[in-house]
From Swiss-Prot:
The keyword Flavoprotein applies. Its cofactor is FAD. This is FAD-dependent monooxygenase resA. InterPro entries: FAD/NAD-bd_sf, FMO-like. The lineage of its organism: Eukaryota, Fungi, Dikarya, Ascomycota, Pezizomycotina. FAD-dependent monooxygenase; part of the gene cluster that mediates the biosynthesis of the tetrahydropyranyl antifungal agent restricticin that acts as an inhibitor of CYP51 and blocks the ergosterol biosynthesis. The highly reducing polyketide synthase resH, the short chain dehydrogenase resG, the cyclase resF, the FAD-dependent monooxygenase resA and the enoylreductase resD are required to generate the first stable intermediate desmethylrestrictinol. The gene is resA. Pfam families: Pyr_redox_3. One of its GO terms (molecular function) is monooxygenase activity.
């Protein structure tokens, strides 16, 4: 039996395993992944030509291994192949390669008792091999199971249908380069749709790009740089976080002093000034693209105009290939439709809800996102571990969470009144559709059969991925090993309800998955304070407020925590 099995060999899985082994070097740790190479989103199977990371060089790495800059583009963009190579280097340096089993897709995870005592049993698809572990760390995150909408007529459709996740598969790359594939329909408006359209145009195809009229609209794409600085860096500043209302307070307080003064006690004038600052930033991001200069451009305008950056009705992205806008505005090889696909016909026709038909579609690429649920848990187990589920809570638990939801929504809008200005109030939701994870890592309550035996890393979508994943991995390690004190279940549940209520009010796109775009540094601060670590890593207050936070700023944080634990043991605390 393994001490720990980590499901997923991407960014989260590698750092979670490395951190656990650093704390428990004699532990038997196994990492399993269904792909043929490590990397998760950045595995070889998911890389395709011209794909580059949104994060700027120096921000897309872990604190204990700088990325080799030889393959980085002159403007700081990181090719996808360089990201994959970095993760292989990381796994090699920390002796993880020999602990990884690839081509092992886990189809079932369950908690059971037996001769081995209470443990987790993982069943691999195909072989039905069973793996057993005392503890599991789930790192498959929020982009693991592809979502393809129901497309009536798909079985008879003579063209091909695939998810954007498959664009890097060798057979897909070969098909796209095939001259017989001339016309492609791309469905979706997220960053992955922009990347897919760029790939197809570079391959010489013509594209009909279909984006639903409803929903959050197309992603707001920021330029590579703003005022001479890479736009992605703005997210790594505490200054930006100060302008975002969030509930991640200091110990013993629900809001920090700044949040209390600026976002809680302030009047309408302060809220107006805050929103004005965000609108100015929004304008600087939108201005380079000239949305109104063409019919195609107008159809890509963010849903909320100058309020799109603050409220984020759709996920934000960095326009890693700005030359795509020339193709968009010319309209010669790409045409954008604000419509929905209602069906497919045998003769390669794609039907839209407006009644229009797109003919000769050799390929349909669905850039339509991901399932929020993790199917390797049974429906009732999904709810037990804190994940959204298709099953329902028992009536008592359901009423408890509904009451907590209502109370939390009232409290969060009273404490952060600017959130009452949300232009699209959150719709009623099943409480079973929420993630019920304390700190987005641990289940809401521990039962005798689940006590500190499972943790999650990568279940909060942010712009500071490596920094967040390292903090979550250390928190998860401390939690699983019993070195971290956590509140009793009722308090954990109240805090979970608060953060869920905040996300629904703060980020419109956070109503599908947990989201903290501009607030990840305060979230990381909270995790490190839980662990007894000072999260302020800069040399002075000016640098702390205005400086750029990089992963390197947190170098040595695991060793620091281990030293603190050893000191506690020596002192008998």
């Amino acid at each position: 039996m393994y001490d720990v099995i980590v499901i997923g060999a991407g960014w989260c899985g590698l750092v979670a395993a490395k951190t656990y082994l650093q704390a428990c070097p004699d532990a038997q740790v196994l990492i399993v992944d269904g792909d043929t190479s490590i990397g998760g989103t950045w595995s070889k199977e998911r890389l395709y030509p011209h794909l580059v990371a949104e994060a700027h060089y120096g921000l897309f790495e872990f604190s204990d291994l700088p990325m080799n800059g030889d393959s980085v583009l002159p403007d700081g963009r990181i090719p996808s192949t360089a990201v994959h190579a970095y993760l292989v280097e990381y796994a090699t340096k920390f002796n993880l390669i020999q602990r990884i089993r690839l081509n092992t897709w886990i189809e079932n995870v369950r908690r059971e008792a037996g001769e081995l005592g209470m443990h987790w049993t993982l069943t691999a698809a195909g072989s039905q091999e069973q793996l057993h572990a005392k503890k599991v760390i789930i790192t498959t995150g929020l982009t693991s199971e592809a979502f393809i909408p129901s497309l009536p007529g798909r079985d008879e459709f003579e063209g091909e249908v695939l998810h954007s996740k498959a664009l890097g598969h060798p057979q897909t790359v070969e098909r796209i380069s095939d001259p017989s594939i001339r016309h492609v329909v791309v469905y979706g408006g997220s960053k992955s749709a922009f990347d897919a359209v760029y790939l197809l145009l570079r391959a010489g195809k013509t594209v009909d790009w279909v984006i639903r009229e409803g929903g959050g609209g197309p992603s707001m794409m920021t330029p590579l740089s703003v005022l001479g600085q890479p736009s992605f860096r703005l997210n790594n500043s505490r200054l930006l976080a100060l302008l975002s209302p969030h509930p991640f307070g200091t110990p013993g307080e629900q809001l920090s002093w700044w949040q209390r003064v600026v976002h809680h006690r302030s009047g309408q004038w302060a809220q107006f000034m805050i929103l004005t600052i965000w609108r100015v930033m929004n304008y600087l991001f939108l201005r380079p693209w000239g949305y109104d200069s063409s019919p195609n451009g107008k159809r890509l305008k963010p849903l909320l105009g100058l309020d799109s950056l603050f409220w984020s009705p759709a996920t934000l992205g960095v326009m890693t290939h700005p030359e795509l806008w020339e193709e968009i505005h010319s309209g010669q090889r790409v045409k954008i439709h604000r419509d929905a696909i209602t069906g497919l016909a045998r003769d390669k026709r794609v039907m839209l809800s407006s009644g229009q038909e797109l003919s000769s579609a050799d390929l349909v690429v669905c850039a339509t996102g991901w399932h929020a649920r993790h199917s390797f848990f049974a429906p009732e187990e999904q709810l037990a571990v804190g994940l959204p589920g298709t099953a329902s809570f028992d009536p008592k638990s359901q009423q408890k969470w509904l009451d907590l939801q209502r109370t939390a929504d009232r409290e969060i809008t009273e404490e952060l009144p600017i959130l009452q200005k949300n232009p699209i109030p959150p719709p009623p939701l099943r409480c079973e559709d929420d993630h019920h994870l304390y700190r987005f890592i641990a289940p809401s309550r521990e039962t005798p059969s689940h006590e500190r035996s499972i943790a999650f890393v990568g279940f909060l979508r942010t712009a500071g991925a490596p920094i967040v994943y390292e903090a979550q991995s250390l928190w998860a390690t401390a939690y699983l090993t019993g070195a971290l004190e956590v509140p009793e279940a009722p308090q954990r549940e109240r805090e979970i309800a608060r953060t869920n209520a905040w996300i629904r009010r703060r980020y419109l796109c956070g109503r599908k998955v947990p989201f903290a775009l501009f607030d990840f540094l305060p979230y990381v601060d909270m995790l490190y304070r839980d662990l007894g670590i000072n999260p302020n890593r800069k040399p002075n207050q000016i640098a702390e407020l205005c400086g750029l936070y990089r992963p390197q700023d947190f170098k040595g944080v695991v060793s620091e925590w281990l030293a603190n634990q050893q000191a506690k043991d020596v002192n008998g605390n």
